[in-house]
Amino acid sequence: MANILKKWVESDARELKRLGKKADKIEALKEEMEQLNDEKLKAKTTEFKERLQNGETLDDILVEAFAVAREAAKRVLGLFPFRVQLIGGMVLHGGNIAEMKTGEGKTLTATLPVYLNALGGKGVHVVTVNEYLAERDSSEMGELYKWLGLTVGVNSSEMTPDQKREAYNCDITYSTNSEIGFDYLRDNMVVYKEDMVQRPLNFALIDEVDSILIDEARTPLIISGQTEPTVTLYERADRYVKTLADGDYTIDWESKSISLTENGIRRAENFFKTDNLYDVENSALNHHIDQALRANYIMTKDKDYVVSDGEVLIVDSFTGRVMEGRRFSDGLHQAIEAKEHVEIQDGAKTMANITYQNLFRMYRKLSGMTGTARTEAEEFREIYNMEVTTIPTNRPVARDDRPDLLYPTLESKFKAVVKEIRDLHIKGQPVLVGTVAVETSEYLSRLLDREGIPHVVLNAKNHAREAEIVTNAGQKGAVTIATNMAGRGTDIKLGPGVVELGGLAVIGTERHESRRIDNQLRGRSGRQGDVGMSQFYLSLEDDLMIRFGSERIKDLLSRMKIADEDAVIRSGLISRQVESAQKRVEGNNYDARKNVLQYDDVMRAQREVIYAERQQVIMEETSLKDVLMPMVDRTIDRVVDAHTQKTQKNFDLETIVEFARTALVSDKDIHQADVEGMSAKEIKDYLKQLADQMYIEKEKALYDPAQILEFEKVVILRVVDQHWTDHIDAMDQLRQSVGLRGYGQLNPLVEYQQEGYRMFNEMITDIEYETTRLFMKSEIRQNLQR
């Protein structure tokens, strides 16, 4: 550990020295900038933009741009960034994390890299933990950016898509992390490019970066959609396929695929009262019929699945065991439930999902600032490729951080906490009490009420009220109880006469499992060189001590217990033992987050393929023939390959021709005699020629290339979206089940990767087959809705 610390200190010192030289250059421009009148200073923005267009880089103009933004901040905000803030700004511009203590002006520091990067014209996102902070910072700092000729937007959950688009099109956009995530997912579900709101993700600067990238890293953002109407569709499809006779469908047992014959198609059109089963409007119906066919004629009860207590359970074909928690994908499970007349489990379906880890790793450049990141430096480096640099404080820290006090019981600990609060309150010194849980803050509040000590309780519920309470927490005689995260982002300024009383006293009622959260609480006191004090009160009955308290501490306390219930140990040993317990918990939490990321990376790779495909389709402005016809060709290749494995005279021509009739052309356009005597390659070429002719006929039927393009978009998007949402569900089921089973001696992650890859390839095959069938067999109509 000592070596790691030494490395950090040395690398920080090197980095600060390097950036210090640049800061000197910015400082050297101070007088030159002061000489410029307002118009000339504002004109610098246009000059910088032109220089960037002429080939200069952001790094080339950094020194001048920082000097301009610094002088503008003085004129507009009445604030002049210190030298340490210039260094912090450069760390952020470099795509790294600036660790700046509370009160060191993070918000002002951010204006420098935000201004510089906004000059590139690709958009800068300033990300905050709540909408109140986004509103506050955008209106306060927005004055500066607007004065310098840049546009500023704020993105919130109440906005319409048009308002969001306007906010994202600004040079600088303030938003919460969750709103950016949901907008990204929604953008990848739209069917018209005009409905998208975001531009490509360029540069994000995250405030309270540890909270978003570490504490919330495992939180998935999920968009769900209800799917109740499809329950009846499963039942109707099931009733229909149960009426079929042998000649109405063909089964290919090798690939376990099944399709309707021309006869079966006619029966379906009568049953469902539709003119053309393969019309685009019937894509959902087709999907349900396909699954009902598989459920009834391919899947066998007590071999592929069992029915137990009204539930369909999968049987593992290798072990013969029931696979708890797994469901067949792509709607097959629901089709079997309809077949067996048990309840169809088809509630909310996940339409799209992503974790913050993968969302923010998609930005071209990512940076962040916080008062506490050093303890998580390894995680930031390994997962986000961001280095943490600790920025020196503008003035030396004058806070008195006292050693922990340890009591035998919770009761004796809280007795001591209340006594300390009372003593400080009588003196008039403001007190901020930090609790780990909401119930602790309420319990302590009741104790203070009993003592008649006026106080305010702050639970992170009302952000606007929260800021007001935090602002007043530094006034004479104030007693504020707050849970961990409450009030981050708002400074506690000391009221008149408080410095003389010793500044803000911070009391921690227990140690959090993360050192970072404890450091955040301490850091509320002693801002900008103010005096202050911090003290943690612990007991042997605290969660952390019960889980990780070492034997040495327990021995000490067993001796204490005999002496006095209210006895206290004040010792560096306690603090060291607690810290080592915290490090163990942090290590466990990091491993858990890393594990989540490894699983999520499988989904990320798949998501990127599907979203890129959708983007290509949505953005296309002339023709999708180059996307669509290769899908048709690959589908033909797969079908022909599967049925020409044997010698030529044993080719399964009947199935190949049946495929051509149901997915490519009409009955009269192909007969078995047409492909007799052909090699596999000749059959493929012949079918591809038929498909090309079919495409040309569709072009002729419509005349208008715009309508053909629209038709192509409708077909591809409907099929892709249907299969992708089913696939997300299936991957979710797979993930839960590999965790449950642990696959004996096998690595669950490897199993998830391999099985997930197989399922994804299967989905792509299904998408291409269904797109082929829908496009080739549909009649193109005008005014189609995507």
Curated annotation (Swiss-Prot):
Binding positions for ATP per the UniProt entry = 85, 103-107, 491
Its Gene Ontology biological processes? intracellular protein transmembrane transport; protein import; protein targeting; protein transport by the Sec complex
> What role is this protein assigned?
Part of the Sec protein translocase complex. Interacts with the SecYEG preprotein conducting channel. Has a central role in coupling the hydrolysis of ATP to the transfer of proteins into and across the cell membrane, serving as an ATP-driven molecular motor driving the stepwise translocation of polypeptide chains across the membrane.
Can you state which reaction this protein catalyses? ATP + H2O + cellular proteinSide 1 = ADP + phosphate + cellular proteinSide 2
- Could you tell me the keywords of this UniProt record? ATP-binding, Cell membrane, Cytoplasm, Membrane, Nucleotide-binding, Protein transport, Translocase, Translocation, Transport
State the Pfam families in the record: P-loop_SecA, SecA_DEAD, SecA_PP_bind, SecA_SW
Could you tell me what this protein is called?
Protein translocase subunit SecA 1
Q: Which family does it belong to?
A: Belongs to the SecA family.
Q: Which GO terms describe its molecular function?
A: ATP binding; protein-exporting ATPase activity
Write out the GO cellular component annotations: cell envelope Sec protein transport complex; cytosol; plasma membrane
Q: Which PROSITE patterns match?
A: SECA, SECA_MOTOR_DEAD
Please give the subunit comment from the record. Answer: Monomer and homodimer. Part of the essential Sec protein translocation apparatus which comprises SecA, SecYEG and auxiliary proteins SecDF. Other proteins may also be involved.
Topological type in the membrane: Peripheral membrane protein
EC number of the protein: 7.4.2.8
- Family annotation (PANTHER family): CHLOROPLAST PROTEIN-TRANSPORTING ATPASE (PTHR30612:SF0), SECA INNER MEMBRANE COMPONENT OF SEC PROTEIN SECRETION SYSTEM (PTHR30612)
Compartments where located: Cell membrane; Cytoplasm
